[in-house]
Amino acid sequence: ADGRVTSVKSVCGDKEEIFDGDIFFSSMPVKDLVAGMGSAVPAAPAEIAAGLPYRDFVTVGLLVDKLDLKNETGIKTLNNIVPDCWIYVQDVGVKLGRIQIFNNWSPYLVKDPQHTVWVGLEYFCNEGDDFWSMDEKACVDKAVSELISMGVINKNTKILDSHRERVQKAYPAYFDTYDRMDELVKYLDTFENLYCVGRNGQHRYNNMDHSMATSFEAVSNILSGKKTKENIWGVNTEAEYHEEAADEKKA
């Protein structure tokens, strides 16, 4: 009402609750936020929001006794495992997109980092496709098979534990109606007490640091009375941050 959000409705199963408030933060997918506003949304922003695309994500966690990858760097690691946190997979013969080694983020993430390694195997897919819908055992078996085929582990490696996790809308994508995102932002900013933050809240492929920074900027605006939200939407739009720009600068 009058350019302000006055309440939100929470629906969980058969239970509905109304929450009144003075200030509202939204980190939900902006596509779903606008859809939830109903028929009051003008046609243009509704169309833009409905057309925003996403890439979904499945990660398979495996606890193994060791990796066959050798640490051939000068970087010292606990138990001399490879020092990478992430390894991007370019092998067209497998579906796996990225390997994450949790021991290298922090050994405290692993119960016994001296004798075991937790790896996360990341698969990019679409919600509802064959890989997304695969049962957990088949998914884990495929992940193990692909690691063996790449020589990351071998058929005698002990798989001590496993877990499959699906993540909806993990990657906001920059095609379809995204080229009209500025129009949608302009509409959302007509609600002076609504702050869209985070990766999905802004439909921006930000890392965790920048996603959190959008919230810091929002709180700063609220405390200072600043009305414009350009600084919130502008987090991580500086071209020099991005890897490709850094590479160009080196060249």
Give, region by region, the residue ranges found by the protein language model.
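C-terminal lid/capping helical subdomain adjacent to the catalytic/cofactor pocket in oxidative enzymes
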Residues: R164, Y174-A251
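Mid-domain catalytic core of redox enzymes
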Residues: A1-V152, E230-E240, K249-A251
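Flexible, glycine/charged-enriched surface loops at secondary-structure junctions
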Residues: N154-L160
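Short, glycine/charged-rich beta-strand-loop motifs at protein surfaces that mediate ligand recognition
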Residues: W132, A170-A173
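Short Gly/Pro-enriched loop/turn and capping motifs at secondary-structure junctions
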Residues: N126, K169-A170, G201-H203
